Amino acid sequence: MHLRHAILLAVALAPTLARAQESYKIEVLKQAPPEALSGAIRGVLDAQGYRIVDDQGKSYAEIWLRKGTPAQGKPAGSKGAILFPVLKEGELLGALRFSGEGYDYRDQAIASGAYTLRYGLQPVNGDHLGVSTNRDYALLLPAAKDTAIAALPRQKLEEGSSESAGTSHPAILMLTSAPAAASSKGEPALVHDEEKSTWGAVIPLSLAVEGESAPVTLPVQLIVVGVAPT
């Protein structure tokens, strides 16, 4: 029985391992946000984005960030298990489009197409022990249904995101700190963690800080390939 379970597990994990073992790179995408997004959402996104491509040059995902994500203050480090306490839960961060079938950090299959990206926090309820050391995530919501800019309350955020995966669990991408070596260059980068088998897009999130006339840049790392430890 144990052998059978091991074989079934290996078969189930095969696609995940294959994706993680591929090579990826990030490039600037000089293309406007997709028409699948609402006009209101497109209006607050950058005119160009970032494309994640595999070693064959095939696009895996495309990302557009918000021109100025509202922030409650200047970034000043983490607060407990929250890396980005200046961000409000449910706030719009940007948008993502999967060129083909994509996968979230829980290895849930996500259909090709456009999704909004909103900031969320992992619940502290004992169900997520060992998944990650921080609580920060970007939740994917269907572009056709998430059409307003305003931040969403937690229940609507999680329910809307669950529709992206077609399950009872939100569709999530891990949001974590950008390595200093990658973020100091001021250019987008893709970081490969061989131990965790993840690929993270290091991209500059522009913050509209209360009381500040100029935007503040916060480098973040969005895990676009790879899954949570089991």
Name each region found by the language model.
Residues 86, 127-131:
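Short consensus segments that form the blades of beta-propeller domains
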Residues 58-60, 89-93, 110-112, 133-135:
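Extracytoplasmic
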Residues 10-20:
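Hydrophobic h-region of N-terminal signal peptides that target proteins for export
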Residues 21-84, 141-230:
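Primarily secretory-pathway and cell-envelope proteins
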Residues 113-119:
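A short tyrosine-centered beta-strand micro-motif
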Residues 78-85, 92-101:
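N-terminal post-signal-peptidase region of extra-cytosolic proteins
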Residues 1-7:
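Bacterial N-terminal signal peptides that target proteins for export
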